[in-house]
């Protein structure tokens, strides 16, 4: 009994160290993100005339958007991996990201380039929620988790086909907008998108408080049901929360991959399996990772900015291949 208490105490201390380290990492990347750019502006100059423009009007809204989207994508990945008992699950697996893409592309094509940014954001959220509610219709039939997963994959393929057709028939101007969205980027984010950032906050906070049901889900469907967890209810709530977070993220920055896949899995490999620690750790690590990718996207080229989706794919693809090989070796 004493050894078990000692082990629990050591595990608690280790978790606190991880959370402290991730908090420190987030603060450092946040500071660098605000300072870095075509001109390096140290904190001492943030209140100057130059700082008022570059920091408070340009870099701060972008940095906040990157932080929130990174946290949302990593949290969505943690939810998917617990819900589907699959370490390779990620936010786009259920087709929700592609659904948001279809909504945004439909707005671009039908709006003829005259729709304001907030309308495009609403269309992306609507597309994500539409796919989410279709999935909930499947869930009402009490499908198994694996069948619900396959239904999401099928919906994602359909949405991907629709996006391909849209690109094929689009004009040159619309095509540039669509290709920029497909590669992901925060270049157009300013304070006008503040409402989208605020829309993420309540769902992020709610998901972070759901460690107990997620811990039960991680035990497997049978064990969770035996312990009294209403699977159908929590499956619906978590799918809707994921749909909302992914939809708002796509509306802010377009398609960004690998954050939701890699971050939760790496943290689990580091021993953070308890969702009481994993969820806040995912938020901070996801935000830090996407902030780092955004800094690279801004500074890699002197005359242009790389799409952040390209950066995350370049850095995340080798890790994804390693995860595939590792999971195959375990299987």
Curated annotation (Swiss-Prot):
Membrane spanning residue stretches: 18-38, 64-84, 91-111, 114-134, 149-169, 194-214, 243-263, 277-297, 305-325
The organism's place on the tree of life at top rank: Bacteria
Gene3D superfamilies linked: ABC transporter involved in vitamin B12 uptake, BtuC (1.10.3470.10)
GO MF assignments: vitamin transmembrane transporter activity
UniProt topology in membrane: Multi-pass membrane protein
InterPro entries listed in its UniProt record: ABC_BtuC-like, ABC_transptr_BtuC, ABC_transptr_permease_BtuC
GO biological process per UniProt: cobalamin transport
Function: Part of the ABC transporter complex BtuCDF involved in vitamin B12 import. Involved in the translocation of the substrate across the membrane.
NCBIfam families: PRK03784.1 (NF003001)
Subunit structure of this chain's protein: The complex is composed of two ATP-binding proteins (BtuD), two transmembrane proteins (BtuC) and a solute-binding protein (BtuF).
Official protein name in the record: Vitamin B12 import system permease protein BtuC
Organism per entry: Klebsiella pneumoniae subsp. pneumoniae (strain ATCC 700721 / MGH 78578)
